A protein has these predicted regions:
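A generic alpha-to-beta junction signature in SAM-dependent methyltransferases
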Residues: 81-82, 146, 238
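Substrate-binding groove/exosite segments of carbohydrate-active enzymes
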Residues: 3-121, 125-128, 136, 247-267
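A generic short-segment signal for beta-strand/edge and adjacent turn/coil regions
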Residues: 26-28, 168-170, 178-179, 227-237
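Non-catalytic carbohydrate-binding regions of carbohydrate-active enzymes
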Residues: 32, 42-45, 86, 92-95, ...
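Flexible, active-site-adjacent loop/turn segments at secondary-structure boundaries
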Residues: 8, 15, 49, 85, ...
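The feature captures the catalytic groove of carbohydrate-active enzymes
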Residues: 89-109, 140-225, 249-262
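Extended, well-ordered alpha-helical scaffold segments
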Residues: 16-24, 66-79, 124-143, 199, ...
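Short linear sequence elements within intrinsically disordered, low-complexity coil regions
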Residues: 15, 52, 132, 162-165, ...
Length: 267
């Protein structure tokens, strides 16, 4: 597998700043945890899992200091992808056992950071192929499962799908949701979601870039066209030209013109 000779050196004539950086690096290393024999960087601050929302990105950033640990923050999600293509929204260690959790998506800051590791790790072709396989399978899963009403727009089914903990716009939607069909009898969900559409777009855009790297012009054009199809649907279905913004649509296809208290204030 990939190996990289990475490291970071910080120099300053300011002794206070030098000590501050040293202590910050020491604190960060406390967030390196053992997941079944593999070191990973957890979020910290009491968050002891790795979430798809943040930690592939966090790992890619940390890889310049510790490549093996940073790489594992992406590899763990790739290794624990289900046979149907779904990627766990989080991975935990429970009673000493690594447990992938499929009860939410929890964002999708994964494709681009994972591709960054390809370059940082010396352009390993096997890793690139594994990443492509992961993204293609997840994109296929999304379109097979998350367009329950067939309107061509992918859906969020619970608050944790988009990382919007306690979001009022979700109304009575569940926090996590483990089933492969949408919850029934809820006020808003399934919601046609710009977030979940962006998950597909990110997969397809990155797959086009992987095809370019691999010298496959035909596949590059195909994935680029598929990415544009997602983008076009988002614009045609979710964009509000008068307001200059996108808005999700609820289960009845009504535009969700939700604003937070902060957005209504004069701040």
């Amino acid at each position: 597998m990939m190996q990289a000779n990475t490291g970071v050196r910080f120099e300053t004539k300011d002794p206070l700043l030098s000590q501050l950086v040293k202590q910050a690096e020491e604190k960060c290393r406390l967030n390196i945890k053992n997941f079944g024999g593999d070191p990973v960087l957890v979020e910290g601050g009491g968050y002891e899992k790795i979430w798809l929302e943040t930690q592939p990105m966090g790992g890619a950033m940390y890889a310049s200091r510790d490549f093996a640990t940073g790489l594992n923050n992406s590899l763990m999600f790739m290794r624990h992808q289900r046979a149907d293509g779904r990627i766990p929204g989080s991975i935990a260690v429970i009673d000493g056992k690594v447990v992938p959790q499929f009860n939410k998506f929890q964002g999708f800051c994964f494709p681009e950071p994972a591709l960054d590791l390809y370059y940082l790790g010396g352009k390993d072709a096997e890793y690139l192929a594994q990443l492509a396989k992961t993204l293609e399978a997840f994109d296929a899963y999304l379109w097979r499962v998350r367009d329950s009403d067939g309107d061509g727009c992918l859906e969020t089914w619970c608050k944790y799908d988009t990382g919007e903990d306690h979001a009022m716009r979700y109304a009575d939607a569940p926090d996590p949701w483990e089933e492969e069909t949408p919850p029934q009898g809820c006020t808003a969900v399934p919601i046609a979601s710009m977030d979940v559409m962006s998950y597909s777009y990110a997969c397809r855009e990155t797959l086009a870039e992987i095809a370019r790297i691999s010298g496959d012009a035909e596949a590059q054009a195909q994935w680029a066209a598929k990415a544009k199809a997602v983008q076009d649907k988002m614009v045609s279905y979710l964009w509000d030209d008068a307001r200059g913004a996108m808005f999700d649509r609820d289960k009845n296809h009504n535009q969700m013109l939700w604003r937070s208290a902060l957005s209504r204030s004069t701040c």
